[in-house]
From Swiss-Prot, chain A:
Residues 513-523 have a biased composition (Polar residues). It is found in: Cytoplasm. It is an enzyme of class 2 (transferase). This is DNA-directed RNA polymerase subunit Rpo2N. DNA-dependent RNA polymerase (RNAP) catalyzes the transcription of DNA into RNA using the four ribonucleoside triphosphates as substrates. The Rpo2 subunit (Rpo2N and Rpo2C in this organism) is implicated in DNA promoter recognition and in nucleotide binding. One of its GO terms (molecular function) is DNA binding.
Swiss-Prot record, chain B:
It comes from Halobacterium salinarum (strain ATCC 700922 / JCM 11081 / NRC-1). Stabilizes TBP binding to an archaeal box-A promoter. Also responsible for recruiting RNA polymerase II to the pre-initiation complex (DNA-TBP-TFIIB). NCBIfam families: PRK00423.1 (NF001658). Zn(2+) binds at residues 29, 32, 48, 51. SUPFAM superfamilies: Cyclin-like (SSF47954), Zinc beta-ribbon (SSF57783). Sequence repeats lie at residues 142-225, 236-317. This is Transcription initiation factor IIB 7. Coiled coil: none annotated.
């Protein structure tokens, strides 16, 4: 490559658009479909109206959601466009009204379903990132920016809440939905564990498969105290016969031997027995019917939630869960036999970054739930007093606004994390740039965590090897390398799966159900 | 900068306290009888400015700790909780039992303790509102908050609305009227009192009672409570209507000018202020070449086109313009 070409390339990495690009991309994606995804997930708000006799149930259907560009509402009720500089100077929030389509529906039991009211109503205000697509200054030329008092060199990428500029810290998390095998010790013995942080729609569940000192496999997952036998669980999921279980775990003769030990110790032989057994664990001392109901609910709700998918039947999901557990078991055995090394948690392939858009999505989800609870309450109250139910009289837009602004203003995020938002470092221009490109490890700074602080070979080209603070945060707070490229997750997994299927991958859930029936469903 | 904000805060705090003091009516120097008392926050004293007597010492400074640079620090360093507010039935002084089943160290508590906390929580929730009057207030205040939130009414006005409602409750004016009706009229009255009027139409859109009832209840409570409401100045409506119609500042000032000159000639008396403002805006938009149709203006102001036409005719005649 020619010298000039190299220079041009490296210069383009320092251009204004590149500096906070990861923030813009992530936040724009959130505005474009992240917000809608959350609303579509929620779908509707149910109420307790209709629980009584001769009363028709009422619920609210949620439709399209959209945010406009930032506006300020003056005390006299007039609304005007707001530019960042005005927000900074007047100590107000740079946020845009959010509108959502809502319709109140009554009926369904004896009467026909009837829409009582349907309107697009203002549900709250969303803080807007300076420089994002919805920002009022996006697309302005330098002259226009100077005209409205904005600094043309300012990189943007932060929010303005009550006049103070706040960046959302990118956080570095362990990759979800991935099997990580590692050694652990229990009562002085070394054991092998396969871990998966299963994540779907903001719900996160840790599933552990352990090989204890007797060589037996145990699984633990949320809502079940302690651990349950691996064989019982896969049988409950519909993988019944000994042969199939062994075959699904591995063909390796030594692992087969381990598996046979496990099968010998099994307390149950059929799916029914297994579910009964599970029921006794999750709802002991309750009635038999309730135990069964609860066991099924726990399996479908709390075990490996990331394997669920729209349009895939519960039955198929269950068997996929069983296969997935078999993969985890295999990882355990391989580790025990020394066929593989323990996974490196500091390897960058095992890390995912949560950028502003992902954080805002978490926030918006809880805020919307809060709003839904309030709407439910208002509806029930209005109904109790026999008032007409209209969308405008049941939505309190302050609820959502408050829930969105407060965490950004204080840094206390949902899920108990603190320090997520920070005041933009305006010491000098370099300070701002560095701050926008900073990332934080969620590990506690009071513990040593020597490996996590070390420079890892896989950080090459991604993380700056020298820019990290001295002292307790050393190695936990990092900065992006200048030429770092941050890839985003796939928006539409279906497309990806279709593509994979066309390349010959078999047994992808929900895609090739009709093509594969007897062939292996391994990945 | 910090210094100045601090001073400002102290000043406002001092002012507030003075106001509270004056309500109590005990603030005069016991020595010389002067009411020229000065609060010196540096020494935490209340001093008579005329004779120098220290009336009160070791006062508590409710302000935040020294040096707080931003909102968060101010909150962290503050030595007191949130101020009391009239918008909550208990003025925001409740004790709530946290839903987290954790002790002071953040450890989970035993199941026995947990069920005890559950019971305590339930009863705390039940006895928080001790009687029917209190329940009434709780319901009404949340209605006021709901409507104010939908209308985008600022905090201070909600406070005023709550005070009006509280007074109505105290004087037993609610009897025979619906809670929602009185709450809505209290909010309407508060908006007018604070100079950011909302029309009855706007209010009734977010209220759960009808316009007629709001008007009736409003007249009743404003009379009984002696609210002495002056007719609304049509100029108060101009900025809002103009921004909704996306008209420029120029039109706004022109409309204000029209209202001022014509009101001096007594055209306003007996006319609806919204209609009057709408007509002035319509006229101003014509004069400034930013024409809006009567229909558009009427929609925003929630009056009829006929009203606009009539007021418009009167106004341009008085202004001596012939449109």
């Amino acid at each position: 490559m020619l010298q000039e070409d190299k220079r041009e390339l490296s210069e383009s990495y320092f251009s204004k658009e590149r500096l906070a690009e990861h923030h813009f991309r992530s936040y724009n994606a959130f505005l474009e479909h992240g917000m809608q995804d959350v609303v579509t997930e929620k779908e509707r708000i149910e109420t307790d109206i209709g629980d009584k006799e001769d009363e028709e149930p009422v619920w609210v259907e949620l439709g399209d959601v959209r945010a406009v560009t930032p506006r300020v509402r003056e005390a006299d009720g007039s609304e005007e466009l707001l530019y960042p500089q005005e927000a900074r100077l007047r100590n107000i929030t740079y946020s845009a009204p959010v509108f959502m389509e809502m319709s109140i529906v009554r009926g369904g039991e004896e009467e026909e379903e009837r829409v009582l009211d349907t309107t697009e109503t203002k549900v709250g205000r969303m803080p807007i990132m300076v420089g994002s697509d919805k920002c009022n200054i996006s697309g302005f030329s330098d002259e226009e920016l100077i005209e409205i008092g904005e600094d043309p060199a300012d990189p943007g990428g932060y929010f303005i809440i009550n006049g103070s500029e706040r960046v959302l810290m990118t956080s570095e998390d362990l990759a979800p939905n991935k099997i990580l095998a590692e050694y652990d010790s229990k009562y002085g013995d070394e054991i092998q564990v396969a871990k998966t942080f299963s994540q779907r729609r903001g719900y996160r569940a840790l599933v552990l498969v352990e090989r204890n000192r007797e060589g037996l496999l145990e699984v633990s997952f949320p809502s079940v105290s302690g651990s349950i036998s691996f064989v019982t669980l896969v049988r409950a999921l519909g993988l019944e016969s000994d042969e199939e279980i062994v075959h699904r775990v591995s063909e390796d003769p030594e692992i087969v031997k381990f598996m046979l030990e496990n099968l010998e110790e099994a307390d149950v032989q059929t799916q029914e027995e297994a579910i009964e057994d599970l029921g006794q664990r999750v709802a002991s001392g309750q009635g038999k019917n309730y135990q069964l109901k609860r066991a099924n609910y726990v399996i479908d709700r709390y075990l490996l939630p990331h394997l669920h998918e729209d349009g895939v039947e519960e039955e198929e999901t269950r068997i996929n869960k069983a296969y997935y557990l078999c993969r985890m078991a295999e990882a355990c055995f391989e580790l025990a036999l020394g066929r593989r090394e323990a996974d490196d948690k500091d390897h960058y392939a095992n890390k995912r970054l949560k950028v502003s858009g992902d954080l805002m999505k978490d926030l918006f989800r809880t805020a919307l739930n809060k709003l839904a609870r309030d709407v439910k309450y208002q509806l029930e109250r209005a109904n109790m007093r026999n008032r007409e139910l209209t969308v405008n009289t049941v939505v309190r837009s302050d609820v959502l606004t408050e829930r969105l602004e407060h965490p950004i203003a204080t840094g206390n995020w949902v899920g108990g994390r603190s320090g997520v938002s920070q005041l933009v470092d305006r010491t000098d221009f370099m300070g701002v740039l560095s701050h926008l490109r900073r990332l934080r490890s969620p590990l506690s700074r009071s513990q040593p965590h020597f490996e996590a602080r070390d420079l890892h070979a896989t950080q090459w080209g991604r993380i700056c090897p020298s820019e990290t603070p001295e002292g307790p945060n050393c190695g936990l707070v990092k900065n992006f390398a200048q030429a770092m490229e941050l890839s985003q997750d796939v928006d539409d997994e279906r497309d990806l799966k279709q593509e994979l299927s066309s390349m010959g991958v078999e047994g992808i859930p929900g895609i090739s159900m009709e093509t594969t029936s007897t062939t292996s469903a391994d990945d | 900068m910090t210094r100045s904000t601090r001073q400002r805060e102290r000043e406002t705090a001092a002012k507030q306290e003075e106001e509270e003091d004056s309500e109590e009516g005990v603030r005069e120097c016991p020595e010389c009888g002067s009411d020229n008392l000065v609060k010196s926050s540096d020494r935490a004293e209340l001093v008579c400015n005329d004779c120098g007597l220290v009336v009160e010492e070791e006062q508590i400074d409710p302000g935040p700790e020294w040096r707080a640079f931003n909102h968060q620090e101010r909150q962290e360093k503050s030595r007191v909780g949130a101020p009391t507010t009239q918008t909550m039935h208990d003025k925001g002084l409740t004790t709530t039992i946290d839903w987290k089943d954790k002790d002071a160290y953040g450890r989970s508590i035993s199941s026995k303790k947990r069920s005890q906390m559950h019971r305590l929580r339930k009863w705390q929730e039940r006895i928080r509102t001790k009687d029917a009057g209190e329940r009434n207030l709780q319901f009404a205040l949340s209605e006021i908050d709901r409507m104010a939130s939908a209308l985008g009414v600022p905090r201070s006005v909600r406070e005023v609305a709550s005070v009006i409602y509280r007074r109505a409750l105290k004087e037993d004016l609610i009897r025979g009227r619906s809670i929602e009706g009185v709450a809505t009229s209290a909010l309407y009255a508060a908006c007018r009192k604070e100079g950011i009027p909302r029309s009855l139409e706007e209010i009734s859109e977010v209220s759960r009672v009808e316009r007629k009832e709001i008007g009736r209840t409003y007249r009743y409570i404003s009379q009984e409570l002696g609210l002495e409401m002056k007719p609304v100045d049509p100029k108060k409506y101009v900025p809002r209507f103009c921004s909704e119609l996306e008209l420029t500042e120029e039109v706004q000032s022109k409309a204000n000018e029209i209202i001022e000159t014509t009101a001096e000639e007594g055209l306003l008396s007996g006319k609806s202020p919204t209609g009057y403002a709408a007509a002035a805006i319509y006229a101003a938009s014509l004069l400034c070449n930013e024409k809006k149709t009567q229909r558009e203006v009427a929609d925003v102001a929630q009056v009829t086109e006929v009203t606009i036409r009539n007021r418009y005719q009167e106004q341009i005649e008085a202004m001596g313009i012939h449109g």
